[in-house]
Amino acid sequence: MKILILCSTLDLTKPFGATPSLWQLLKGFYEEGHELIVIPYHGHAINTLWWRSVQNPNYYEGVAMDKILRLFNKPSRRVSRISFIPIIARLLTKPKLYKIIIETLRQEKNIEAIMMIAVPLNQIKGLANKIKKQYAIPIIHYDLDVPTSLPSHGGFTFNYIKGADLSEYDSIIVPSEGSITELKELGARDAKVVHFGVDPDVYKPITVKKDIDFLFFGNGGSSRAKNLKMMITDPSSVLDYKFVVSGRDLGIDLGRSRILPPFSFSEWRNFCCRAKINLNVVRDLHANVFSTSTSRPFELAAMRCCVVSSPYMGL
């Protein structure tokens, strides 16, 4: 099957936590025999052995949007930020996306499905319906951020489902069983669960000296502050063990742990294999919504790491 994919980004240098999972998913599609054509919503097009990429028609608009988000990245400005971004995107970026998608469908001729992965739906509201007026083709949305992206939880950077029309899509795919009911209440015609997994070829263990007692890597501290305190802040303050922490926007007291800059992927694997115990400290929301999967336990297990995890409401 030939599939056209619109995804959040292909750029591993962008601070989007799901991008490694996205790469593995696309590689898996290729290995199952599918031909992929990928349009990134953010960042440059990147060709690989596993897919062809079409240039992002809104690259410079994305750069400008990054600057706007940094400018408005303050709680006092949060309401304004939520309200105007989807409007600007629908006016400026959606027409270019529609044009390049239609051009690609015409040129390739035999694309059998369109999949949108982790893109902000309220910024492209109406796009799927407009495409279907010309092409009778199934369009699926795969949201890697549910339940955080749901309007009831406010989203990550901004609330990108609020105001979207989920009925445009033939199916919505999410990694959270406990979120299905809300998706249907929001208008999804069909909702299915695909839990996270990992590519064992990517997460191969390496043999290195175990010189770190406890390791944690993750982005965002406030969303898991209680468990970080329990598993890192308090024990590192009283135990004579080496705690190492890395990530973005942690912003909380982490006791006597050693704080390192965010790892690249290859650095992270090396540190994981150096650690005697890897800490999986899940966000509160992912832990408390029933049967919501996160990729970290499977990544660590594939590398044969010893893992101590904060609890989940159904792993």
Describe each region flagged by the PLM.
Residues K2-W50, P57, E108, I117-L127, ...:
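Nucleotide-sugar donor-binding catalytic core of glycosyltransferases
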Residues I140-G155:
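A short, histidine- and acid-enriched strand-loop-helix "catalytic/donor-clamping" loop
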Residues L69-N73, D143, V244-S246:
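Short, compositionally biased low-complexity segments
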Residues Y41-E108:
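A conserved catalytic-core segment of Leloir-type glycosyltransferases
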Residues K132-Q134:
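Acidic (Asp/Glu)-rich catalytic clusters
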